[in-house]
Every structure is written in C-alpha cells, then in structure tokens.
Design a protein with these regions (language model features):
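SH3-family beta-barrel domains
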Residues: 18-38, 45-53, 58-101, 106-116, ...
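Positively charged n-region of N-terminal signal peptides that target proteins for export
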Residues: 1-6
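Bacterial N-terminal signal peptides
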Residues: 7-18
Length: 148
C-alpha cells in the first residue's frame, strides 16, 4: 500500500468513526420518566426525569436506553419516554441569548444556569440557535449549554 493510499484510507476511517461516535441526544418527551439503575422495571429507581430534560444516549438494550444527564449521572430508561425533539440546558452561570451569532449582537435575554432551551438549529461554529418557552429565539454560545 502506498503512503497516499494509506493516508486516504485513514482519513475515511476517521470520518466514519467521527460520525459513528457523534453524541446522540434526546429529551424526555413524556410528562416524566423514571430512571433506573438497570434496564428493567425491577431495577432500583434512581430518580424521575422531568419533561423536556435533555439526555445523552450512551447505549441501547432492547426497549431500554442508558442515559447521561447534564451532571454526568448515568441511568436506564424505557426508550418510549424519550422524544427526538432536542432541548439544551444552560450549564454556565448564565447564558446571553443574542439576536445574531455574534458577541456584539443585541442581547435578547439572559438565561440562568439550569434553564431549558429548545434547540432550533444545529450548531454552527461556536453558536447554537435556541428558543425559550416564552417564544424568544436567538443565538447562544455552544460552550454555555449542554445537550449538543
């Protein structure tokens, strides 16, 4: 194998891995979802996840998914309680939602740590377009939120 062919093959494999390894986020779609320590209703109940809470899917086992929350806690939940709708949560002390993806754009609102925002568009560079439940939509820095 020539060096150029080796490099081309390595590049294709890295791109495939990056796609396969991309984080899979969902949000709690049911009014609430019970999270367990094992993939069965006979497992110990860890806590109740509220509607809209963003979660990262780590693994799938039948009708169950292993999840991670914003605090890094892991648990199991029935997949039927999750929604493909994407929400994010503010992880910084506060996040400024701006009119455009620019630090000099007008601030539309400030969201405190823990506030849920709907993900409107996928991440573009360092910014993400979000919407608050009050209808205010704008851009927030990706580093200030969790769930993307």
């Amino acid at each position: 194998m020539t060096i150029s062919r080796f490099i081309a093959t390595a590049a294709v494999l890295m791109l495939a891995c990056a796609h396969a390894c991309a984080a899979d986020f969902r949000s709690v779609g049911a009014p609430s979802v019970v999270l367990y320590d094992a993939p069965t209703v006979k497992g110990g109940k860890r806590y109740i996840a509220p509607h809209g809470m963003p979660v990262e899917i780590l693994a799938r086992y039948g009708d169950w998914v292993k999840l991670r929350d914003v605090d890094g806690e892991t648990a199991w939940a029935e997949s039927k309680g999750l929604s493909a709708r994407r929400n994010v949560v503010v992880k910084a002390a506060f996040a400024r939602v701006r009119a455009a993806a620019d630090d000099n754009a007008p601030i539309l609102m400030t969201a405190d740590k823990g506030v849920l925002l709907e993900l409107v568009d996928p991440q573009v560079s360092d910014w993400v377009r979000v919407r608050h439940q009050d209808g205010i939509a704008g851009f927030v820095r990706a580093a200030e939120i969790w769930g993307i």
